[in-house]
């Protein structure tokens, strides 16, 4: 009797804590482990997708929502929207004009979150890949190409003031793997 009641309570609690919000849009889930985009269609759709493994993580919806806003802000050159989903440390390192100049011709797409790990300090490490197109003049030094594939780890920190995760700075984000499309 007691075991059945405890199991039932645990099941209801787990369902309540981990069920998706009833009015939330469905999370795009990638069926493969990489994205291929036909030549000429780069960078691909601007939708942030997650792998099935990430979908099982309790924070997947928050991570997807924040990253979607992050990439939408870059693609639409909306600095204030970008600032709303990054930490104050990150936004202080990239003032408005630097953001606008740096992303002037950038379009990001084919965004896939592979993994979400928790760091010892409680922050997240989000492994993702995406494609970017940009003018050659705007391409990063050492990677002068109009189309790049990025594999990077974005740190995310909890912002208690806004009660949400935010993209952060840190050593995890400083060593992306970049190659031409």
What does each of the following model-derived ranges do?
Residues 79-127, 133-138:
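Short solvent-exposed beta->alpha transition segments
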